[in-house]
Amino acid sequence: MVQAWYMDESTADPRKPHRAQPDRPVSLEQLRTLGVLYWKLDADKYENDPELEKIRKMRNYSWMDIITICKDTLPNYEEKIKMFFEEHLHLDEEIRYILEGSGYFDVRDKEDKWIRISMEKGDMITLPAGIYHRFTLDEKNYVKAMRLFVGEPVWTPYNRPADHFDARVQYMSFLEGTA
C-alpha cells in the first residue's frame, strides 16, 4: 500500500525520504480530499491486466507510453531530473503507473505544505489538473513508468506561479468544496 507523509523543510538531497519530525503520515482519504487518486495493480501483468483496462475505460485514458528514468537510458538525464523536480502544474491530469523501480511525487496540501507520496512497483496515481506538484527518483535512481493520457498526450509543465490558469482556478474551487 502506498505511503505518504508531510515533508520536512530540508533542501538537502531530494532523493531522501524527508519525513517531518515527528512523523506525520497522510492517509489515502487525505490524498483523495486533494483530488489525488490511487490504485494498486499487478505491474507484472500490465500488458493484459483487466483491472488496468477497466480503469482506463472508466477514466478515458486512451493513450499511453512507457518512460524509463535512469542515468544510463534517459537522454539529458540531469536536465530532465531538475525539470521534473521543479514545482509545477498541468492543465490536464497527470497519470503514472510504476512498472519497476520507485520514486516520489510531492503534492501541496490545502495549506501549501508538501506531502510526499512514495511510489513503488504496482502503484498507479492520478494527480488532478491544477495541483502543484513535482517528481523525483528515490535513492535507487531508477523508475520505469507508464504515462497515461486522455486523448493526445500533452505534457506541458507550468512552473509556479501559475495561479491564473483555469485549471488552477477550478482546482482551488474543488479544494474549497472539500473543506
Curated annotation (Swiss-Prot):
Pathways involved: Amino-acid biosynthesis; L-methionine biosynthesis via salvage pathway; L-methionine from S-methyl-5-thio-alpha-D-ribose 1-phosphate: step 5/6
Protein residues bound to Fe(2+): 88, 90, 94, 133
Location of this chain's protein in the cell: Cytoplasm; Nucleus; Cell membrane
Membrane topology: Peripheral membrane protein
Transmembrane parts of this sequence: none
Entry EC no(s): 1.13.11.54, 1.13.11.53
The protein's name in its UniProt record: Acireductone dioxygenase
Chain's gene name: Adi1
